[in-house]
Curated annotation (Swiss-Prot):
PROSITE patterns: HD (PS51831)
Native source species: Alkalilimnicola ehrlichii (strain ATCC BAA-1101 / DSM 17681 / MLHE-1)
Example GO biological process: tRNA 3'-terminal CCA addition
Domain notes: Comprises two domains: an N-terminal domain containing the nucleotidyltransferase activity and a C-terminal HD domain associated with both phosphodiesterase and phosphatase activities.
Protein name, as recorded: Multifunctional CCA protein
Coiled-coil annotated residue ranges, if any: none
Oligomer and partners: Monomer. Can also form homodimers and oligomers.
Domain of life: Bacteria
Signal peptide extent: none
Cofactor: how and how many bound: Magnesium is required for nucleotidyltransferase activity.
EC number: 2.7.7.72, 3.1.3.-, 3.1.4.-
Residue numbers binding CTP: G8, R11, R91, R137, R140
Length: 413
């Protein structure tokens, strides 16, 4: 029985990156051998065990054989006869198909180290095409390693295009799409994930709502990049730069979906796109089974981002409706994520990436003065039922109007 460190830990060691988790392959052993040593079985589809002390994963060396469409369509075979090289052969990319022996020796049968040095993301074998999730993983690695200068090997991109043409990508289930998508969104540079998917044709199958934005013009006076899809990716890059969490980045990605439904005869304008986008956002979130927090923020940013941008121009009554539409008087925690997404949208324009967003400070102050108006004095004054709500609304509008009168206007940019 021999144990090898495999996969991402070996790759990250060679790149000089922090190793966050370690996975191991055990060659020449049976499940009983590990159980006798106190390892706890956790694998449902194939033999994976947790170390009794470190709780790191140890998997028996295995091979796999394609039996049907999608990532579920595999039969696995684990036995003491399976070699390390056979186990590494089933992995997706050469940079993930290396191992280290306990004496430090590097086992690299598929030239992963060479591809690391050449900054190439290359598939191990034609078996890559058997699992559509690998396209998403490839795109995610392109995002993760973009700062290091990695690119997808041309032959790997060609194989991905063939997978899309063969319909293999259509077998992806929503849970796996969301799992890879959400991980990619949280990378420091998430944009290459979508670039790679678009380049191989997978974006149109996995996220058609997003793919449709490319080629749709925008007014160049406001959007020097001139293309809705490009603006969306620029805004996404800004959301990462500003430190947005997953709900913020997801909301930014979806905020302009409504522009795909604008009749071409009114291009490059997109009147009411914020209204038309809401049902598209809701349907996409439902299809991918996105978490509630992601759904809620995406819907609100889609619906209200234009009002946030125009905050200084709104009437006091409209400003109050914005605060109420965001449900801030009950859910104050929504304010900062909403403002961050709106700032990313405003900065997601070619040449305007460092533009200030004074609307955020103003909207914080607007919420503060409006929230300071409560029902208590009106209840104490004897107001009843609807009278109370009407009085609170009147007083909040009065407070917001006073704020607008006294608040210093920002310089035009």
């Amino acid at each position: 029985m021999k144990v090898y460190l495999v996969g991402g830990a070996v790759r990250d060691q060679l790149l000089g990156r922090e190793v966050r988790e370690r996975d191991w392959v055990v060659v020449g052993a049976r499940p009983e051998d590990l159980k006798q040593r106190g390892y706890r079985p956790v694998g449902q589809d194939f033999p994976v065990f947790l170390h009794p002390e470190t709780h790191e994963e140890y998997a028996l060396a295995r091979t796999e054989r394609k039996t049907g469409r999608g990532y579920h369509g595999f039969a696995f075979h684990a036995s003491p006869e399976v070699t390390l090289e056979q186990d590494l052969a089933r992995r997706d990319l050469t940079i993930n198909a290396m191992a280290r022996a306990d004496d430090g020796t590097l086992i690299d049968p598929y030239d992963g180290r060479r591809d690391l040095e050449q900054r190439l993301l290359r598939h191990v074998s034609p078996a890559f095409a058997e699992d559509p999730v690998r396209i998403l993983r490839l795109a995610r690695f392109a995002a993760r390693f973009q700062p290091l200068g990695f690119r997808v090997a041309p032959e790997t991109l060609a194989l991905c295009r063939k997978m899309v043409a063969d319909g293999e990508v259509d077998a992806l289930v929503p849970e796996r799409v969301w799992q890879e998508l959400s991980r990619a969104l949280l990378e420091d540079t998430p944009v290459p994930f979508f670039r790679v998917l678009r380049e191989c044709g997978a974006l149109a199958r996995v996220l058609p709502e997003l793919d449709r934005l490319f080629g749709i013009p925008e007014p160049e006076a406001y959007h020097p990049e001139g293309d809705t899809g490009e603006h969306t990716l620029l805004a996404l890059a800004q959301s990462a730069r500003l430190g947005g969490d997953l709900p913020v980045r997801w909301a930014v990605l979806l905020h302009d979906l409504g522009k795909a439904t604008t009749p071409s005869q009114v291009w490059p304008r997109h009147p009411a796109h914020e209204h038309r986008g809401v049902p598209l956002v809701e349907a996409l979130c439902e299809r991918l089974r996105a978490p509630r927090e992601c759904r809620d923020l995406a819907r609100l940013v889609c619906r209200y981002h234009l009002q946030a941008h125009r905050a200084f121009e709104l009437r006091a009554s409209t400003l109050l409706k914005l605060l109420e539409g965001l449900d801030l008087f009950r859910r104050q925690a929504r304010l900062e994520p909403f403002l961050l997404a709106c700032e990313a949208d405003a900065r997601g324009r070619l040449g305007l990436e460092d533009q200030p967003y004074p609307q955020a400070r103003f909207l914080r102050e607007a919420y503060r003065v409006a929230a300071a108006v409560t029902a208590r004095p009106f209840v104490q004054a004897g107001f009843k039922g609807r009278q109370i709500a009407e009085a609170v609304t009147r007083e909040r509008i009065r407070a917001l109007a006073a704020l607008q009168r006294d608040y210093p206007r920002p310089e035009a940019h």
